[in-house]
Amino acid sequence: MERKVTRRAFVQAAALSGLAAAAKPDWRARDFSAAGEKTAGNQGLTQFVEIFIGTGGHGHTDPGATVPFGMVQLSPDTWTGGWDHCSGYHHDDTSILGFSHTHLSGTGAADLLDVLLMPGTGPAHIDPGTPENPAGSYRSSFSHSQERAEPGYYSVFLKDYGIHAELTATARVGMHRYTFPADPASHFVIDLAHGIIDPPQRMHTNVISSEIRIVGSDTVTGGRRVKEWAPGRYIFFAMRFSKAFTAAEIFAESKPLGPSVREAQGTSLKCVVNCPTAKDEVIHVKVGISSVSVEGAMKNLEAEVPGWDFEAVHRAANEAWELELAKITIETSRLDHKKIFYTAFYHALVAPTLFSDVDGQYRGMDLEIHRLPAGAKNYTTYSLWDTYRALHPMYTLVQTERLPDMLNAMILMAEQSPAGVPVWPLQAVETGCMIGYHSAPVLAEACVKKIPAVDYAKVYPLWRKRAMVDDYRGLGYYRRLGFIPCDLEDEAVSKTLEYAYDDWAVAHLARAAGAHEEYQQLLDRSRNYKNVFDPSITFMRGRFADRSWASPFDPRGMGHSKKWRDFTESNSWQATFLNQHDLYEYMKLFGGEKGFVEKLDTLFNQSSELPPDAPPDIAGMVGQYAHGNEPSHHIAYLYAYAGVPHKTQARVRMLLEAMYHNDPDGLAGNEDCGQMSAWYIMSALGFYAVDPVSGNYVFGSPLFDRATIALANGKTLVIQAQENAPDQPYVQSVTWDGKPYTKSWFSHAQIAQGGTILMRMGAQPNESFGAAAEDRPPSFG
């Protein structure tokens, strides 16, 4: 049976439990300064990162300690049930369960939260309790006024125990520092049953198997296999304490196994280790993790944190973040803009996550153990339906040293996975979440931009199979009929449109491989979007197998019936502008440029009302434009193709100001592994990739007075906005290295050479800039 492929299942489960889409307080009315307080000595760019942005509302981010693209995300968990706890943490909560070592950043589906550790004093409890009923549990209350976070560091005071907890991390190791009060019964709880509880009423995660072993008097090792969103994934750990414990006991199904039992297997395992403490005594704990084995976790631990110097690990984590954040420097008089930008940059560098051990071993998508060539790294956590749009284009500018490994990891997945090419891979398991197969545009973009050290010869045969052979989620109908019938397949309109874009991407891979006939076939097929466009109403619309149009039709609705949704986390208003690659042909369907622009204007000026069954993913509304979900992200830039880029400039500047704020509820929707932030980064710099596969960017409205991007080839790109101001969003003129530049777009090849783009801004639009046909962005070329 096919697993549900969208995030809607998680949203619906949360709604049933009363935990989703509840009204939230106004964060801007709260004192956020204490949560954003920085540690002494943090004076670089990391001081501008407000990690709590996105931890409230529907942002779904966590505030914990990690390094760029780290395997470990060591963070507090406040609750693990309900849609708004996909990351394990929500800023509304007032108690902490403990600190687990893996987290998803901003997703709308939930998993991970592996290897929970919680310190305590007094009698040990092994029940996690609930936010509503914490009595007799190991959780503790806390206050945001006693909580701090910065890149690579988190701290909180656990009020119920009088313990100060601090966290930092390397790539594969989480390091804890706990300052205890005097107590002969101080202890730690290790909970291998902790994790996402879906549905929330179940009260424990779905563990297939787990094992735990007490080694000597200072080490605990183990692992588990979990059946949640990524069913059947493995995680192993090696945990070492700086102080020998005086006693240790394993619990199975909440029952103590006795002090003589040193190891156990089961589906609900916990362990309590006792460490009596004096006043202000510090105990360190370091935890290595691995998808391969306990031995792999121990190797990671010993290689990355051989000693007990917490501050050295903290400094190294901070320096790693400084190195990455320094790739883009900005000048602006508005501190909030600077904080939002560097927080967005931070969030954009969390995933994909490292997925190979220090010895090069990793678990493949066939669940077997493989070894990489020396120096190579493997990655996981690819939210491709989201991130192909802006995050991966951003990486081609600022992550070119990691990008080959990230791309080669996807090729390995396609070779090893029984599910074929990656869709939403997580820790060696294909979740199958969301539609399309948008690893294709990521690899096609890299091929077009000539990203080196990638084995492109392997790519086309693997992705060709999905495009030309696989009977995958309606692709058989799509190939035979040119569209997917909405009475035979759920979300048929969105699937048709996204397969058309994937065809466009695979066509580029075919051309690179010399498969010229199939290149043309795929190119032609990428115009299948026409087959779900109803010219009588100028909307994308569901179509039955007999080719008749689905009724009833409401462009705000999710589909033509409660049984059959026609759109994926969107409606017809948003799907009607999903076209990214064939804009000039597409405009003809609206009667030309004028009709297309009028339709775009109407989208933004419509009522924002949605039907009751609309998922909360459709958020951040401006008319029927939904910035809180990815299908809308390129839409404001489409005006440039119709010769009116000044409308793009006005819309983009408005979205930059309205959809991002310096507070916990500061995102318009899910962060989605960096995509929501990448839109902000690219747009604030002044350009965006409407069609990433083309290798081109469209000008928007730069937010900063000056931005400098350090390119990997040693060159720099400077974007300077002259006479920039909140009421001056319009581009009056552009010069490139001092020469007049009249186009509303540029290519990746151009900016890869560096240079200075000077944009003179004004309060009134210059309607001649970018208006001429020869100055508009290319499309389908």
PLM feature spans:
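Accessory carbohydrate-recognition regions in carbohydrate-active enzymes
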Residues: 32, 36-441, 447-497, 505, ...
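ATP-dependent phospho-/nucleotidyl transfer catalytic cores
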Residues: 502
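Short, low-complexity interaction segments enriched in Ser/Thr/Pro/Gly
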Residues: 1, 21, 34-35
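Extracellular attachment/recognition segments
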Residues: 730
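Hydrophobic membrane-targeting alpha-helices
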Residues: 22-26
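Short aromatic-glycine motifs in intrinsically disordered, low-complexity regions
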Residues: 717-725
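N-terminal secretory signal peptides and thylakoid transit peptides that target proteins
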Residues: 1-18
